[in-house]
């Protein structure tokens, strides 16, 4: 009580035990919250808005600003937000930009790869699951299969190996398990150690001269850093701007 707390935004999302502890601490103490990516959507700001006294609780926020889709019965899906002008004003009240100069400059390079255009058009036209040999049933399955076809192309795998030949230590971010299977099956070389961080395994960062660290976005985009390499490969992109920025920041530190 009557102390000063500095929080890492990574833990202050959602509505779990960390957020509940955050609420208790902020009631009787002064605090600041550090974040490189404040939020993808308005619901990411709910814990901070509540801690500042703008809303009583999450239900109060939802009642004032959230409209759920009527066509999604399995789980609640947000259709749109109401009174976003107020949300913008509240966000401007709590965000403080911290300008600083980095000794390093990030270099992002787009690598162009190919994909099977015939199969791609076939999926679009026939709505047919080529892997399970059955009709596509939902829009989400349709998009997933198009993405799978593109991400599994051999040209993408070849580009990964080309980069690894010139960069002895790389972090590779991916989304899906089938991408992990592809990455684990690549021939990086006999002297290259391969480790992974995902929902199945959390292996430590390799210590050798040549390695590839395979990281699933949701598991390892936040909360750690690496100063042993200057190269990240995004095998596939994540839908979230916040996740992509956080993943990029694993090697973009003040001491790198």
Give the residues covered by each predicted segment.
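Inter-Walker segment of RecA-like/P-loop motor cores
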Residues: 1
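Conserved P-loop NTPase motor "coupling/switch" region that bridges the ATPase
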Residues: 4, 21-102, 256
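Hydrophobic residues in beta-strands of the RecA-like P-loop NTPase core, especially within AAA+ ATPase
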Residues: 7-8, 248
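A short beta-strand-to-loop transition that corresponds to the Sensor-1 phosphate-sensing loop
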Residues: 9, 34-38, 174-176, 215-218
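Conserved ATPase-coupling elements of RecA-like P-loop NTPase cores
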Residues: 10-22
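Conserved helicase/translocase motor-coupling segment
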Residues: 105-190, 199
């Amino acid at each position: 009580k009557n102390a000063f707390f500095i929080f890492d935004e990574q833990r202050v999302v959602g509505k779990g035990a960390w957020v509940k502890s955050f609420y208790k601490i902020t009631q009787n103490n002064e605090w600041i919250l550090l974040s490189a990516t404040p939020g993808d959507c308005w619901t990411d700001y709910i814990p901070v808005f509540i801690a500042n006294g703008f809303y009583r609780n999450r239900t109060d926020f939802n009642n004032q600003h959230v409209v759920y889709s009527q066509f999604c019965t399995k789980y609640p899906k947000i259709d749109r937000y109401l009174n976003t002008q107020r949300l913008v004003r509240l966000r401007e009240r709590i965000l403080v930009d911290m300008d600083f100069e980095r000794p390093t400059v990030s270099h992002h390079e787009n690598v162009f790869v190919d994909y099977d255009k015939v199969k791609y058009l076939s999926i679009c036209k026939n709505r047919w699951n080529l892997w399970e040999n059955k009709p596509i049933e939902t829009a989400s399955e349709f998009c997933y299969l198009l993405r799978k076809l593109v991400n599994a192309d051999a040209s993408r795998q070849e580009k990964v190996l080309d980069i690894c030949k010139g960069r002895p230590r790389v972090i590779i971010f991916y989304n899906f398990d089938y991408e992990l299977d592809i990455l684990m099956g690549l021939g990086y070389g006999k002297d290259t150690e391969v480790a992974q961080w995902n929902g199945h395994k959390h292996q430590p960062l390799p210590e050798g001269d040549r390695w590839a660290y395979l990281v699933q976005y949701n598991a390892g985009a936040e909360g750690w850093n690496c100063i042993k390499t200057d190269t990240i490969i995004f095998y596939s992109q994540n839908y979230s701007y916040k996740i992509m920025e956080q993943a990029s920041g694993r090697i973009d530190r003040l001491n790198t």
